[in-house]
Every structure is written in C-alpha cells, then in structure tokens.
From Swiss-Prot:
GO terms for cellular component: chloroplast; ribonucleoprotein complex; ribosome. InterPro entries: Ribosomal_bL36, Ribosomal_bL36_sp. NCBIfam families: rpmJ_bact. This is Large ribosomal subunit protein bL36c. Its main location: plastid. PANTHER family: 50S RIBOSOMAL PROTEIN L36, CHLOROPLASTIC (PTHR42888), LARGE RIBOSOMAL SUBUNIT PROTEIN BL36C (PTHR42888:SF1).
Amino acid sequence: MKIRASVRKICEKCRLIRRRGRIIVICPNPRHKQRQG
C-alpha cells in the first residue's frame, strides 16, 4: 500500500474507490494498491 498525495490508475485493471472519505486504488496487482494521504 503506497500512500500518496495524488493517486491514479497505473494499469487498466486498477479501480478507484472512495472509502471513509479517502480515495483508494484496488487492483489484482498488489503493487498498485494506493491510498490518498
């Protein structure tokens, strides 16, 4: 899980989701997991 100021999709399978007011990227590739800090 990377915590970044700006999250974006890395591949076409990444999905942007809002959880508890935070933007999260979930993807089958675990290296692409991100969260907005």
